Structure formats: structure tokens, C-alpha cells
């Protein structure tokens, strides 16, 4: 493409001709030119550039058709280094235009159709169409997934999914295809089977986001695991486990509601699947060789976690409700849904120490505290692989997208000085932030979890009304963290059955949503009905499970799943030595030279 040098050359030629008449004299600047000199080179002014372009192209293609003066000027230019082997500019332009036309004829073309979407007209092979279909669902299947238990959220299905479906409309469902689905498969299956399978996988009650991850190895790992696993293939014992944990979550909420009506408890009614989710994370993280797990969370669901997971005694919680508890020892007088706890939980891989950090009212501010505690524990254990101590942060959907400390904590996740080998983030997504339900009023992104994309963390969305899917995605998240030592997000999408703190009436601000919620069965009822229908449990057994839980609560028995009954000294830290300690006491702070050298590496 002809640029500035071309016109600079024309101007230089004019100056040379002018200066040749004044050899031996000092060269004149353009500012000192006479009117006659300006007139003599006025044909080279900037206003004539378009004309000069065409004239020069004519000279290059047929020099005899232009006047002698112009021909002499262009001949003298062609003898300089800047203009040797010059080519016709218009031919360059035409060449590019032809390339664009050719590309437009071959590229993926879309035309408007009556339904307001698009249809591609480019003919593709069946193999190419199926490949496009698979890739579209892997990347955007989550936009069509059944993630909202209330079915209130309007789906914004990605255009690639719409096109992928239209692309295969003319292909016989009996066509046998083999396109690396499931990942690694060499077998051919009927097209109708492939479509049904991939829709259930990527647009069922699970929605996976991982196409934003730049590392192909990570993407392929997720695809391989997800497509070759069947989360619905669980045995009867696992189903009973899920049922009992849902009974625990729902049972505590109903008990507290009846015993302390109108009092704040910030329950997880509508997201009860959180309890089996956390139980599964503890079990799976322990299988991945974790010795300690540190939890951080705000008030939502905290009481349920304390009683049903960590093993806090029911009477201690009731005393906090009644505000007659002893302030001696570790009690601070803070509200019950801010207090921390720790215990040992027995898993199939041995005991694991679990801690829940104290938390103030300020949402998400506990996040960096948890990460700092985990890093300190890892350093104390010389845990260079960063798998002995694992952080799990439980967020609200509104606070995760709205609080700046979340982004700040995520930004430090892969740094050398502050990284902990990945955090498992769990979002209690009840689709309402205090009184705001419509995402258009609360954020500028499709999902509340989109902030995690900037560190390329995979995001696993799951419908909270499908506890079996919740269990599966918990295992997948824990295994991803173990494999890649990176953050991972579980978006547990449910609803909030009561008001913000059980003392308010949410129907005044969200009447449509809460009319739907009142008609919607709890996840416990839905799952119980499913198991009874499939003969996995009887109604009598279910009623007995409920009575047993209620009896344990009333008798002040621990209702946590697999709470360790044997004190493991290796997992307990003795804090008594720090109580009433002399803080100005001299302490040996020397470090061995080998340790310093090792740390420097």
C-alpha cells in the first residue's frame, strides 16, 4: 500500500529540481519560497493526492498515454531506491477486494429467518455439522440448562446453540456418527442418541463454563470427566445418605422456626442441598489427602452448617438464641450467626480437622482471613504441594458479584506469596440479594459468578433441586482443585423460602417470586417422592429418619455426619498456651540457614 514515503518522494523531487537552479547557494526553506516557486510545484499539493495516485498507476501500466512532463517526473522517481519495483496501487486494492469477496462466499453466512434467529447457508459435511453441534454444546450448553428451580429466569440461549440445532434439521436421526463424543470415544452412534445425550449432559440440571480457560489440558480434563461420568449412577446407600442430610437441613430449620419464631437465623431453606454438598466436599477433599479444611462464610446457612456438619451441640446453639449463655472462655457475646467452630470429622481416608472462621457482619471480609490462615498452616506444615490444608469459601450470589474484596482475593490466588493451591468457592445462589431479584438491577453480567472468569476458574452451575447432581459436581470440583491447584466455583442455584432474616415478609417486594415459592415443593419432598417411587426407600423408613433426627436434637445429641469420636492429637491445636499469655515475652525468632535457603527457592 502506497504510503507517506511516496508523497515525500514527490516533494523531494520538486525540491531537487528547484535547488538545481541554485547550486552554490544556500538551500531555501519552504517558508522562504517566492510565490513563483510555490506556483511551480502547486501540482504536488496535498489536495491532489487522489489524482496523483491514479496518474502514477497509469504511468506504471501504460507510460505513453500521459503527458511528457508527468512521464519525466515519474521516470526520475522510478530511478530512486524508494520507487524501484513499485507496483500498481489499484491492482493491490482489487486483489484485496477479490480476497474479501472470496472469503465472504466461503465464510459462515447467516440470514434472517422468520423466527428472528439466524440460519447458516454454507453447505457442510455431516461430520462438520456434528462437530459444530458438539462444540456448541460444550461451550454454550449452560445457557439452555435447567438451572432455576422456580423456572422464573428467562433463558438467553446462545445463538451458536440455536444454529447448531438448525444445522442438523435436515440430517436423518438414524445417521450413524462418530465425532469424539463422549470424549475419547471411537464408537459410532445414531445421531438422535448423540443429540439426546449431549443435551442432557450440557443443558440438563448442570451447566458448565470452561471455554474461557486458555489451558487446553484443563478444558480437555473437564470434558473427559464430565462426558464419561454418569452422576445419576449412584447406589442405594448414597441415595439414603442424601435423603438423611436433606432431612437434617430441613429438620433443623423447621425446629428453630417452631421453637424461636420470628428470630433471625438466616436459613438455607430453598438451598438445603448445601448440607450434602459440604459433606461430600469434606469426604472428597480428604480422599485427595487433605488433613485440614478451613471454611469461611457469612451468616446465610451458618447455623445449619454448625449443627449438621461441624457437630456443634444443639443446646449450645439454643442458649445463644435465648441469650443466657456463659460469656466465659471462648464466648464473645457476638451474635450466633457470626461464631466459628472446629471439629474432627471422620472420612473414608481418616480424620480431617475442619475449622469455620468467625465472621463479622461485613459480607465477604472473611475471605482473605481464611486464605491467610490456610497459607500459614501450609507453611507451618511445610506443605509445598498445597494439598494438606484446603480452603472452602461459601458466598452469597449478590455479595460474590458485588463486593470488591472478592476480586482482590481472587487476584492473589495464583501469586507465589499468597497462593494456597486453589480455593473451592460455593455460591449459595438464592437469586435474590436482600430484596433485589432481577439481575438487571443487581449486576452487569449473565451470572453472579462471572467475576471468577478473569482468573480462568471453571464455573459449575447446578440446580439445587437435584441433590444427586449437586453431589457429583462437588466431587468434580474437589478433583479439579487437586489436579490443577486452582480456584473452582460451584454455583448452587436455588431460592430463599423465607425472608432475608425470617423476621420480614419478602412478598411485599417480590410478590411474583414468592407466590411461586409458596407453591413450590421443598427439595426434601421432591427427593423423598422420587426415592419412594423408585423403591429406594419406604414412607415408613422416611418417617423414622425424621423422628430420629428430631429426637437427637431434643436430646442434645450431635447430628453431624461422621463426627470423629476419637481425639486425634495430631489434628488438634492446643490454644491454652496462648490464653492470658505475656505478649511482650522475649521469643526466639532465629531460623536455620538451610530453611532460609529452601524458602528462598
Predicted segment positions?
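Flexible, glycine-rich loop/tail regions that form catalytic "lids" or insertion modules at the edges
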Residues: 125-135, 139-176, 196, 488, ...
Amino acid at each position: 500500500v502506497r504510503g507517506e514515503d511516496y508523497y515525500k518522494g514527490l516533494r523531494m523531487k520538486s525540491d531537487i529540481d528547484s535547488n538545481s537552479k541554485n547550486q552554490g547557494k544556500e538551500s531555501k526553506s519552504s517558508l522562504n519560497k517566492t510565490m513563483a516557486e510555490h506556483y511551480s510545484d502547486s501540482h504536488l499539493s496535498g489536495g491532489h493526492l487522489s489524482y496523483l495516485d491514479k496518474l502514477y498507476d497509469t504511468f506504471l501500466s501504460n507510460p505513453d498515454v500521459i503527458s511528457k512532463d508527468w512521464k519525466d517526473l515519474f521516470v526520475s522517481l522510478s530511478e530512486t531506491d524508494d520507487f524501484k519495483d513499485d507496483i500498481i496501487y489499484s491492482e493491490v486494492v482489487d486483489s484485496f477486494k477479490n480476497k474479501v469477496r472470496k472469503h465472504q462466499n466461503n465464510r459462515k453466512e447467516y440470514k434472517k429467518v422468520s423466527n428472528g434467529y439466524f440460519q447458516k447457508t454454507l453447505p457442510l459435511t455431516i461430520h462438520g455439522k456434528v462437530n459444530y453441534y458438539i462444540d456448541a454444546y460444550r461451550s454454550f450448553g449452560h445457557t439452555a440448562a435447567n438451572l432455576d428451580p422456580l423456572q422464573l429466569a428467562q433463558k438467553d440461549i446462545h445463538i451458536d446453540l440455536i444454529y447448531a440445532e438448525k444445522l442438523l434439521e435436515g440430517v436423518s436421526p438414524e445417521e450413524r456418527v462418530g465425532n469424539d463424543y463422549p470424549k475419547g470415544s471411537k464408537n459410532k452412534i445414531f445421531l438422535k442418541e448423540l443429540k439426546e445425550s449431549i443435551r442432557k449432559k450440557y443443558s440438563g440440571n448442570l451447566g458448565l463454563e470452561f471455554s474461557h480457560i486458555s489451558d487446553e489440558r484443563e478444558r480437555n480434563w473437564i470434558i473427559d470427566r464430565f462426558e464419561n461420568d454418569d452422576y445419576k449412577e449412584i447406589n442405594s446407600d448414597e441415595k439414603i445418605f442424601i435423603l438423611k442430610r436433606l432431612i437434617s437441613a430441613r429438620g433443623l430449620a423447621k425446629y428453630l422456626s417452631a421453637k424461636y419464631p420470628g428470630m433471625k437465623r438466616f436459613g438455607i431453606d430453598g438451598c438445603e442441598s448445601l448440607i450434602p454438598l459440604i459433606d461430600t466436599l469434606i469426604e472428597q477433599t480428604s480422599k485427595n489427602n487433605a488433613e485440614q479444611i478451613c471454611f469461611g462464610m457469612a451468616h446465610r446457612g451458618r447455623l445449619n452448617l454448625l449443627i449438621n456438619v461441624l457437630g456443634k451441640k444443639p443446646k449450645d446453639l439454643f442458649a445463644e438464641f435465648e441469650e443466657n449463655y456463659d460469656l466465659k472462655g471462648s464466648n464473645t457475646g457476638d451474635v450466633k450467626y457470626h461464631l466459628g467452630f472446629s471439629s474432627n470429622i471422620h472420612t473414608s481416608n481418616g480424620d480431617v480437622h475442619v475449622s469455620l472462621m468467625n465472621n463479622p457482619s461485613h459480607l465477604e471480609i472473611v475471605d482473605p482471613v481464611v486464605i491467610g490462615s490456610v497459607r500459614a498452616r501450609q507453611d507451618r506444615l511445610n506443605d509445598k504441594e498445597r494439598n494438606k490444608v484446603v480452603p472452602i469459601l461459601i458466598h452469597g450470589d449478590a455479595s460474590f458479584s458485588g463486593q470488591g474484596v472478592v476480586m482482590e482475593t481472587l487476584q492473589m490466588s495464583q501469586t507465589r506469596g499468597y497462593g494456597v493451591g486453589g480455593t473451592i468457592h460455593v455460591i449459595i445462589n438464592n437469586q435474590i440479594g436482600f430484596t433485589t431479584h432481577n439481575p438487571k438491577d443487581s449486576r452487569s453480567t449473565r451470572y453472579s459468578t462471572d467475576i471468577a472468569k478473569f482468573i480462568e476458574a471453571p464455573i459449575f452451575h447446578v440446580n439445587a433441586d437435584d441433590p444427586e447432581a449437586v453431589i457429583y459436581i462437588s466431587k468434580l470440583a474437589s478433583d479439579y482443585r487437586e489436579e490443577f491447584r486452582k480456584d473452582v466455583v460451584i454455583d448452587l442455584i436455588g431460592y430463599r423460602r423465607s425472608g432475608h432474616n425470617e423476621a420480614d415478609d419478602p412478598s411485599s417486594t417480590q410478590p411474583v417470586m414468592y407466590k411461586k415459592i409458596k407453591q413450590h415443593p421443598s427439595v426434601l419432598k421432591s427427593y423423598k417422592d422420587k426415592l419412594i417411587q423408585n423403591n429406594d426407600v419406604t414412607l415408613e423408613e422416611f418417617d423414622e429418619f425424621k423422628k430420629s433426627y428430631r429426637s437427637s436434637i431434643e436430646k442434645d445429641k450431635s447430628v453431624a455426619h461422621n463426627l470423629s469420636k476419637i481425639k486425634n492429637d495430631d489434628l488438634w491445636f492446643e490454644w491454652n498456651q496462648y490464653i492470658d499469655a505475656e505478649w511482650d515475652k522475649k521469643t526466639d525468632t532465629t531460623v536455620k540457614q538451610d530453611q532460609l535457603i529452601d524458602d528462598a527457592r
